Amino acid sequence: KIHIVYSPADANAKTQFALTLGQIVGETQHVLYLNMEECSGLTGLLGEHHWNMADLIYFLRQNKSQFLYRLNSMVQKFGAMDYIPPCDSYTDFCQITVKEWKKLLHLIRSQSTYDVIILDMGTSTGHELELLRQCDGIYMPVKKDPISRGKIEQWDRYIQILDGLDILELLQKLELPPDGTGSGSESDLSMLPEQRLGSYIRELLTS
């Protein structure tokens, strides 16, 4: 299954939710987290690695036959989930086409052993509608302040204009509890499943 975490109004809460969701689901299933943001901010928190998402896409362009080997060689661990280090170059990220994103998801689904893919999706891919249609469910963290509400309402209108009612049917808008991530270090992020956000997600998954 593919679950997308997306929000046009609250990028920080979106990523905290996605990381926590991945770790919790990873306790019982084989989970891969993919960050699809042009500026994830995770490199400093999760550490720098020799390979990242841009390299995986580049390899996909060159040699699809050994894709699974390359994917497995790039996977890193964070708590109970696996992840591919996100792009650290805005230019590299912007050169990835929707066709390549869709091919990547198809190959992971068809060739890997992952039960669940968590997509932490930004608002600058330029292909949100097409990618949202690849998933089995969409989680959207929302805030109550007027600006956030305005952004969500504008996004809803945009989706309806583009005949995206099928996307809205997959959507769950979530008002998250206040976070307790402390200083924002890797150890703080790894503790999210045991904090209020983790309890909220566990209840959400069983409801």
How does the language model describe each region?
Residues I2, V31-Y33, M81-Y83, I138, ...:
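Conserved beta-strand scaffold positions in the cores of enzyme catalytic domains, especially
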Residues T28-Y83:
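Phosphate-binding loop that captures ATP/GTP phosphates
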